[in-house]
């Protein structure tokens, strides 16, 4: 696992980036809006054909004008004080994104901090879930991934990830 403080739309060292999408898959705010803006109108056209995505699930499209071949769209949970299966749904986002990547022979993947922006998921809790799921998935599927990267846009989120990664380092 690797951390990178950057704009995920500019990451060019992976085969796919993960989009923290909404259920319509038609663009929105935060990382979702940025990915749609950079990828261009063909991404929106392909997303329309997917008929949305449920929370915790993942779907794949081409990357279009992005510097990656694919975008894996996943819909994270909206934080509701932890009483609405948010942790299981967030874990499913990471697990299902990795499973879809594996099915499509994607060996290098970059994740944003799913649900921690406008969806309000506490960053520390979200980080622990992300690391745990990725670590377990990669260990259960040895040799299937060359790089799993977390691309974080702001200093505060990056610093939380940096603090939490210590006990979760794994070699791919």
Predicted feature residues:
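Phosphate/ribose-phosphate-bearing ligand recognition and processing surfaces
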Residues: 78-172
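Glycine-/small-residue-enriched capping loops at alpha/beta junctions
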Residues: 1-103
